[in-house]
């Protein structure tokens, strides 16, 4: 699709996607969807220009509280449940993601970012979030023992992190 091709181009030539976005974004809801989908890699990387285009400002006035995991140790094949709260000191559009630094076969680590939601938060509002991440081996992902890191990202900024053991 067009958005997939633009996303691929953005990985090596992000300025070209920005040119297309300048021409297409805001002209029609369909083209807006294409541009947003094309920007998915840059959004996951926390690219400030990409976040700004879609109305995500810096997250200085957003606090993350009580990031906890139900267990600090999980076995391969189990799931990690984690939760947290966010609170804002102003009305703001937020993109909430989490990243896991997975241990790979030779001990190196690879980060994968997962989107939780895109929403609005009101001034003085507190919102709870709970997610479950499976550590079951898949054909596309094999899990390895070791210390992994969970990070919560709001509008491209890591707000809190914690380590957990996969055994």
Residue ranges and their predicted role:
Residues 1-166:
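Alpha-helical scaffold domains
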